[in-house]
Amino acid sequence: MRLQYRVLDTRLGDSIPLPHYATDGSAGLDLRAMVKEPLTLQPGDTELLPTGMSIFIDDPGYAGMILPRSGLGHKHGIVLGNLVGLIDSDYQGELMVSCWNRGQQPFTLEPGERVAQLVIVPVMQVELKQVESFSASKRGEGGFGHSGRQ
């Protein structure tokens, strides 16, 4: 699959690397904080960060997901403000990353720092069918915590 992209910040692909897969087994392309200067997030702060690029998936069978980088969350409490960003196949605007400092210490993001990852996933649009009832299943209406702790 080829993913169309546009560079919106001239530093991207010049002094700051374009997104790429770190290894042959990597699922996500690293997205970078294309801020103009270091940005300090105080505990509890959220900030919408530009990535300097836009994409066009151009296939309704796929979508993009912006996911956090595990090290930033575990070591520093830096996570996505919206937990997961969903990029529809027909979206063509700049990719933005909602960054939230849920940690106890201020954290400074440097220009070009990797802040999230983009994963392309298959999706299916469904046709809704209204029914009066469902055929019985083993789980039924059991919800949160229904299967217990094992």
From Swiss-Prot:
Leader peptide range in chain numbering: none
Keywords of this entry: Hydrolase, Magnesium, Metal-binding, Nucleotide metabolism
Pfam families linked: dUTPase
Reaction(s) the record says it catalyses: dUTP + H2O = dUMP + diphosphate + H(+)
Gene3D superfamilies, A to Z: 2.70.40.10
Required co-factors: Mg(2+)
InterPro entries: dUTPase, dUTPase-like, dUTPase-like_sf, dUTPase_trimeric
Enzyme Commission designation: 3.6.1.23
Pathway participation: Pyrimidine metabolism; dUMP biosynthesis; dUMP from dCTP (dUTP route): step 2/2
The keyword 4Fe-4S belongs to this UniProt entry's keyword annotation: no
Single GO MF descriptor: magnesium ion binding
Broad enzyme group: hydrolase
Residue positions binding substrate: R69, S70, G71, N82, L86, I87, D88, M96
GO BP annotations listed: dUMP biosynthetic process; dUTP catabolic process
Family recorded in the similarity comment: Belongs to the dUTPase family.
Purpose: This enzyme is involved in nucleotide metabolism: it produces dUMP, the immediate precursor of thymidine nucleotides and it decreases the intracellular concentration of dUTP so that uracil cannot be incorporated into DNA.
Name under which the protein is recorded: Deoxyuridine 5'-triphosphate nucleotidohydrolase
Organism, as annotated: Alcanivorax borkumensis (strain ATCC 700651 / DSM 11573 / NCIMB 13689 / SK2)
Gene this protein is translated from: dut
